[in-house]
Amino acid sequence: MNASPTPTATTTTEPATAVVRCRTRLARRVVAAVGPDGLLPAPCESRVLESALALALLTEERAEADATARLTAYLRTTLRTAPPDPFQCAVARAVLGGAGERGERVGDEGDMDAGTALDAGLDGFDHFTAGRKRLMFRTVLAALGATGFPAVPWEAYDTRPQQSWLHMEMKALKVLAAHGTGHPDVVRDEDWRALLPALEPGPAWECNNLAQLLALLALRHSPRHRPALGDVLKHVAGRLRPDGGMPFIDGMTVFTTAAAGLALSLLPAPPACVTPMADALALRRNPDGGYGFHSGVAQSDVDDTCYVLEFLRRAAPDRHRTAVAEAEGYLLALRNPDGGFPTFARGTSSEIAMTAAAASALAHDPDRREEVDEAVRYVVRHQRPDGTFERSWSRNATNAVFRAVLALTGVAAHGEERRSRARAAERALAHLAATQNGDGGWGHAEAEPSDPISTAYAVIALARGPRARPGGPLDRALAYLVERQHPDGGYRSRPDQAGPRPLLYDVPALADVFVLLALAHATATPDPEGCSR
């Protein structure tokens, strides 16, 4: 059941020398960034949505004048120089207000009304969460006075067992809609209780600024709780980034440390920091055995748990035997009856990328063969005719493809099952070859400009295909990555992470981490221990 990286032609050709040099420089940069606590810092950059909500909150409360000025400047500058998606532009314009702001042209969205901007922002978002996102985004715009509140039953704001911050967000939006439409009586005590963690001092609850800001805006409508906002707003103002904006989340330290540790452990001579990195992650497991995306996040998820599990198993399986077993137990507890895995809660929709990740993470345990086979079958069943898969927490198509290819090729199979998996992997790899840009890279979608992160994901998949031919898709992709390396050894990339989906957010450290993981896969030799990520 090993899932060893497949050696490629890059290990023996002249271009391989450049690739190895590139890998070495990048690895040194990543190692140098690991802190004394064993974690790789991964702060999140400012985003327009949270910055606008923070500005709205501080303005309404007449608090933190310096932070208000900084947020205003950040929003005006960003709308003028680097406008995001139409929805976020509409939110920012609603908060900034004034004829002058509304009259400025903001990219192609400058003349859109809020409703049109919402439609444009969700255009092409084909996902099982699309209905809820439309409700969320429309309610945000309505609460800011940009459009009317959606005419939906109040139950539409209720959530089944979901991630903790989504529960808070939907309760906050319900309160805002109820008070905005003159129906405060529909707000129940349990709705208010769900918002109270937002009043805790210090970092945002669950490191999620979006959830806290929505909750604080809602708590303004509570005579009982509004007086407590003053102290909290000081902490909110203290979380602004150097550019004056507010990030979506505090960071992704657990996620990036696990992925970086996995990449470093694939190198011919793993650096000494790998063991402290594994130790640091093992200490941060949650009571349910899983892991969240950042230190201090109590909500575990399949994505982070899979990365941590694979890294711990490869770097220090005996040393962290308990953590490995508990992570496996967490994953198995979330497995759905259809054989797939959701991101956060059993019973919610299974996702391709999460299912493929779980299959790869569990594949090293022979006692989990049945669950792994079911997960791989789920992946095969849900492949699209063009060879792609539904996107998940990444906006680019290559992310789901690389995770699926690793699952499809990482577990031994026989007979028709083996042929079925091979066909699925071939279709996925053929799609990558057919959609590669002329510069050797890939973008978020076909024909979009190439970027290092999207290309790195594709390289991981291609490295698992048949032995690469010189000058083929893999060699061209590696040449693209070599050429895009900065003098400091690092990378800058268009962000691909989305949350709430499909809104992009930027964690710059991810570019270095995933390019290193790609280069490690592309230059690896067979290893009896195996590694599937």
Swiss-Prot record:
The keyword Transport does not apply. Changing residue 163 to A: Reduced activity to 60%. It is an enzyme of class 5 (isomerase). Keywords: Isomerase, Magnesium, Metal-binding, Repeat. Changing residue 501 to A: Very high decrease in catalytic activity. Mg(2+) 1 binds at residue 169. Gene3D superfamilies: 1.50.10.20. The keyword DNA-binding does not apply. (2E,6E)-farnesyl diphosphate binds at residues 132-133, 163, 165, 501. Its cofactor is Mg(2+); Ni(2+); Co(2+). Mg(2+) 2 binds at residue 169. Changing residue 505 to F: High decrease in catalytic activity. PFTB repeats lie at residues 274-316, 324-366, 372-415, 425-466, 474-517. Changing residue 133 to A: Very high decrease in catalytic activity. Requires a divalent metal cation for activity. The highest activity is observed in the presence of Mg(2+), but the enzyme can also use Ni(2+) and Co(2+) in vitro, while is inactive with Mn(2+) and Zn(2+). Binds a binuclear Mg(2+) cluster coordinated with Glu-169 and the diphosphate moiety of FPP. One of its GO terms (molecular function) is isomerase activity. Its EC number is 5.4.99.-. InterPro entries: SQ_cyclase_C, Terpenoid_cyclase/PrenylTrfase. It catalyses: (2E,6E)-farnesyl diphosphate = (5S,9S,10S)-drim-7-en-11-yl diphosphate. The active site is at residue 303. Belongs to the terpene cyclase/mutase family. Catalyzes the cyclization of farnesyl diphosphate (FPP) to drimenyl diphosphate. Cannot use geranylgeranyl diphosphate (GGPP) as substrate. This is Drimenyl diphosphate synthase. It comes from Streptomyces showdoensis.
